[in-house]
């Protein structure tokens, strides 16, 4: 019986935690929005993901990381292009690999 009360107490603590952090309220709002949707989406899970994702404020660090990622992609593309040009120049000045082995 004591084990049952301990598990019940943990559940109650967890429920209070979810209430205080706003999780239950947010989940309820999203589920109500799905319920009230005139045309139910084909994927309820996608609906939940979309609406839960929109409920959280955007972390400013995420935007900085997105900008950094875009810059790194540009640098990568420039490096790939430069690498192609340098390889083309190298072919002009070095004999093919088969000729080197024959020597």
Swiss-Prot record:
Please provide the Gene Ontology terms (biological process) for this protein: regulation of DNA-templated transcription
GO MF, any single term: transcription coactivator activity
Instruction: State the GO CC annotations.
Output: cytoplasm; nucleus
Q: Which UniProt keywords apply?
A: Cytoplasm, Nucleus, Transcription, Transcription regulation
Membrane spanning residue stretches: none
InterPro entries with a match to the protein in the record = AMY1 (IPR026060)
Q: What induces or represses this gene?
A: MYCBP expression is synergistically activated by SP1 and GATA-1.
Per UniProt, subcellular location reads as: Cytoplasm; Nucleus
Q: Which family does it belong to?
A: Belongs to the AMY1 family.
Q: How does it assemble?
A: Binds via its C-terminal region to the N-terminal region of MYC. Associates with AKAP1/S-AKAP84. Interacts with MYCBPAP. Interacts with CFAP91.
Q: What's this protein's name?
A: c-Myc-binding protein
